[in-house]
């Protein structure tokens, strides 16, 4: 399963509920992008969430 290298976000699981309170399993997936960033001074290709990219927590190489 892909996981955000910066924030640790990954797929979350839960239930979807109808008005009659029936339930079925569903998942919430973060918007992950595979980008090249500097890790310990070397370029590395990792999964990063779009939110981390937009907020400037990482910069592309």
Curated annotation (Swiss-Prot):
Q: Name one GO molecular function term.
A: structural constituent of ribosome
Q: Which GO terms describe its biological process?
A: translation
* Coiled coil, from the record: none
Q: Where is this region: Disordered?
A: 1-26
Keywords (A to Z) from UniProt: Ribonucleoprotein, Ribosomal protein
Q: Which residues form the signal peptide?
A: none
Report the InterPro entries cross-referenced here: Bacterial_rp_bL28, Ribosomal_bL28, Ribosomal_bL28/bL31-like_sf, Ribosomal_bL28_bact-type, Ribosomal_bL28_sf
Cellular component, GO annotation: ribonucleoprotein complex; ribosome
Ribosomal protein found in the keyword field: yes
Record family assignment: Belongs to the bacterial ribosomal protein bL28 family.
In Swiss-Prot or TrEMBL terms, this protein is called Large ribosomal subunit protein bL28
The species this protein was found in? Pediococcus pentosaceus (strain ATCC 25745 / CCUG 21536 / LMG 10740 / 183-1w)
């Amino acid at each position: 399963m892909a996981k955000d290298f910066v924030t640790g976000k990954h797929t979350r699981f839960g239930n979807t509920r109808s008005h009659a309170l029936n339930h079925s399993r569903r998942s919430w997936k973060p918007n992950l992008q595979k980008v090249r960033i500097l890790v310990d001074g070397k370029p590395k290709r990792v999964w990063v969430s779009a939110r981390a990219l937009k907020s400037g927590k990482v910069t592309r190489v």
